[in-house]
Amino acid sequence: MDINFNNPTIYCSHSIRGNGSKTMEENCRYACRVADKIERVFPEISLYVPARSDLSLQVLWDAKKISVDDIMYADLEILRACHGWLWINTGPSDGCEEECLEACCVVDEPEDNIIKQDILKANYNATRRILDPIVNAAVRRFRNV
């Protein structure tokens, strides 16, 4: 399948099952809130956020029709089609670690795209300062495709 995005798109890794400190619902809700804020601050880009797109996967997972490996395969295919990558780091996550390795190798993103600050608590200027390098690199990649 050939995946093409119509505007600069950044894959947003986030904890789903994570390290057990929060529920899946809490992790996904937090990721969506952070992504919404980032997209308000940077209207020139889109974020691909697994929490926004995984309802069908969740149905299949609950019915035991797919495995973690199946989900990771799909996520990595989507990541490869994106123009950038960042990780909303909410704690240890095997899936995010795998996405980080893929992003560093294929998308050629540096590991410092791991966002350790709580973007929800950052003001507009701080959010721009933290994410400007990631967004600018994604926009450049999009223009060069």
Predicted regions and their residues:
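Conserved catalytic or regulatory cores that recognize and/or transform ribose-phosphate-containing ligands
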Residues: 1-145
